């Protein structure tokens, strides 16, 4: 009988230990799942941080190029103005003009390598996203809202507007006002 009681006590102790072990296993599995979840979150956050850092570096690079390019645009404007106001027939300025033409060509080629392109909209429809209207002029020969004259070229850097083109836009001629005789 003492053996039965002893075996029963051992059996109860083993059952209690098994229940404790089951609870402990479940607790450890929950901790493992939480640790895996935390690990995935940390990995995702690290990946997002790397992506954000790369985007910031790209933006900084583009911004630096944008500022530099903006600072160069007046130089291009000056070279183009020099060519526009010099005569190709004048022997005194012929060599200087050729030098300015070559300098401007090299400058434009360099800007193309860095995806800086000119917007010269002469004759095209007015686009408020790329053009800045400086004046409106009546003209019956072209469509209304067409660019008649370009005061200053615009520029795009990597497809993004760096400087709008300053333009004169056409408008339809106004209907003639009736004279006093026509009103009567």
UniProtKB/Swiss-Prot annotation:
<dbReference type="InterPro" id="IPR000740">
    <property type="entry name" value="GrpE"/>
</dbReference>
<dbReference type="GO" id="GO:0042803">
    <property type="term" value="F:protein homodimerization activity"/>
</dbReference>
<dbReference type="InterPro" id="IPR009012">
    <property type="entry name" value="GrpE_head"/>
</dbReference>
<dbReference type="InterPro" id="IPR013805">
    <property type="entry name" value="GrpE_coiled_coil"/>
</dbReference>
<keyword id="KW-0963">Cytoplasm</keyword>
<dbReference type="GO" id="GO:0006457">
    <property type="term" value="P:protein folding"/>
</dbReference>
<dbReference type="GO" id="GO:0000774">
    <property type="term" value="F:adenyl-nucleotide exchange factor activity"/>
</dbReference>
<dbReference type="GO" id="GO:0051087">
    <property type="term" value="F:protein-folding chaperone binding"/>
</dbReference>
<dbReference type="Pfam" id="PF01025">
    <property type="entry name" value="GrpE"/>
</dbReference>
<comment type="similarity">
    <text>Belongs to the GrpE family.</text>
</comment>
<protein>
    <recommendedName>
        <fullName>Protein GrpE</fullName>
    </recommendedName>
</protein>
<dbReference type="GO" id="GO:0005829">
    <property type="term" value="C:cytosol"/>
</dbReference>
<keyword id="KW-0346">Stress response</keyword>
<keyword id="KW-0143">Chaperone</keyword>
<dbReference type="GO" id="GO:0051082">
    <property type="term" value="F:unfolded protein binding"/>
</dbReference>
<comment type="subunit">
    <text>Homodimer.</text>
</comment>
<comment type="function">
    <text>Participates actively in the response to hyperosmotic and heat shock by preventing the aggregation of stress-denatured proteins, in association with DnaK and GrpE. It is the nucleotide exchange factor for DnaK and may function as a thermosensor. Unfolded proteins bind initially to DnaJ; upon interaction with the DnaJ-bound protein, DnaK hydrolyzes its bound ATP, resulting in the formation of a stable complex. GrpE releases ADP from DnaK; ATP binding to DnaK triggers the release of the substrate protein, thus completing the reaction cycle.</text>
</comment>
